[in-house]
């Protein structure tokens, strides 16, 4: 199966993308809170 290499790509991707989304959503939440 060609899916054996999938975790080696998926783990760093999730490890980088998930914190990035969390930081951006937190930043937008703080910015909206300051504007209001």
UniProtKB/Swiss-Prot annotation:
Query: Among its keywords, does the record have Transcription?
Result: no
Entry-linked InterPro entries: PSI_PsaI (IPR001302), PSI_PsaI_sf (IPR036357)
Q: What is one GO biological process annotated to this record?
A: photosynthesis
Keywords from the named record: Chloroplast, Membrane, Photosynthesis, Photosystem I, Plastid, Thylakoid, Transmembrane, Transmembrane helix
Q: How does it sit in the membrane?
A: Single-pass membrane protein
Keyword Transmembrane helix listed? The answer is yes
Query: Where found?
Result: Plastid, Chloroplast thylakoid membrane
**Entry superkingdom:** Eukaryota
Q: Which spans are transmembrane here?
A: 9-29
Q: Which Gene Ontology CC terms are recorded?
A: chloroplast thylakoid membrane; photosystem I
Instruction: Please classify the protein's predominant subcellular localization into one broad category.
Output: plastid
Role noted for this protein: May help in the organization of the PsaL subunit.
Could you tell me which PANTHER family the record lists for this protein? Answer: PHOTOSYSTEM I REACTION CENTER SUBUNIT VIII, PTHR35775
Identify its protein family. Belongs to the PsaI family.
Give the protein's recorded name.
Answer: Photosystem I reaction center subunit VIII
Q: Which organism is it from?
A: Zygnema circumcarinatum
User: Highest lineage ranks of the organism?
Assistant: Eukaryota, Viridiplantae, Streptophyta, Zygnematophyceae, Zygnematophycidae
């Amino acid at each position: 199966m060609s899916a054996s290499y999938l975790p080696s790509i998926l783990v760093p991707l999730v490890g980088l993308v998930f914190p990035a989304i969390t930081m951006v959503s937190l930043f937008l939440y703080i910015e909206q809170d300051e504007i209001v």
